[in-house]
């Protein structure tokens, strides 16, 4: 198993956002974690990366426990996060943001990988000298994904990548996620856009108020009556 959480409890101050969460991400898969705002999804991502700390339970990556491991060391292990809200460096150029994604690398593929990002996102190439803060929301999301991919992750964490984006841009972002997966990167996707997430995922977890309330193959979860009513507007997710 590439990533495994067992009975993880975590939160902030007096707030417990994860109440005994267990989930697994097999290598080569796309796994999605869906749920309403405030369910604890982002806390789960931060806990995996070491930004948040688990008070109970274990997080392991490739069989290695991550307790006490610093965030930069988690990145070295092969996990990258595209955070909620993009969080690009607005006073740095597009190219500088991408270079920062590769800051722990020391190989001769960095320039080629940057060109690959520019091929995937032509608008970023056109704006490579522009500051991140001048980009549109969609372009900033492209940059956030490109920055994460520059780290050559084995596991890519995406936290609400479609948030606040126009439908056409959302489709482009999900197409890119699938392309990255096809190239060999495992994906854990947190999304409120359950329909899009369930369309591309292999396996799905549904999170409510800090607990996993449902899990299964994504196609089966998409047909669950409760999921359809709560997240899909009463309709099945089309493939």
List where the protein language model places each region.
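Glycine-rich phosphate-binding loops of nucleotide-dependent enzymes
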Residues: 1-239
């Amino acid at each position: 198993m590439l990533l495994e959480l067992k009975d993880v409890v975590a939160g902030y101050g007096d707030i417990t956002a994860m109440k005994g969460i267990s989930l697994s991400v097999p290598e080569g898969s796309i796994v999605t974690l869906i749920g309403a705002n405030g369910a604890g999804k982002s806390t789960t991502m931060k806990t995996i990366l070491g930004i948040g700390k688990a008070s109970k339970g274990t997080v392991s990556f490739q069989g290695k426990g991550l307790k006490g491991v610093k965030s930069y060391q988690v990145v070295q292990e092969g996990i990258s996060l595209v955070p909620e809200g993009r969080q690009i460096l607005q006073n740095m150029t597009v190219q500088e943001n991408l270079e920062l994604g590769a800051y722990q690398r020391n190989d001769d593929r960095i320039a080629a990988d940057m060109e690959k990002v520019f091929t995937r996102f032509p608008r970023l190439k056109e704006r490579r000298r522009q500051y991140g803060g001048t980009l549109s929301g969609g372009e900033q999301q492209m940059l956030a994904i490109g920055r994460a991919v520059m780290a050559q992750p084995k596991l890519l964490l995406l936290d609400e990548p479609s948030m606040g984006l126009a439908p056409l841009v959302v489709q482009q972002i999900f197409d890119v996620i699938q392309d990255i997966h096809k190239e060999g990167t495992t994906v854990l996707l947190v999304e409120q856009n359950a329909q899009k997430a369930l369309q591309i995922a292999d396996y799905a977890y549904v999170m409510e108020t800090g607990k996993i309330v449902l899990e299964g193959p994504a196609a089966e979860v998409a047909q669950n009556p409760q999921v359809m009513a709560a997240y899909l507007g009463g309709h099945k997710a089309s493939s």
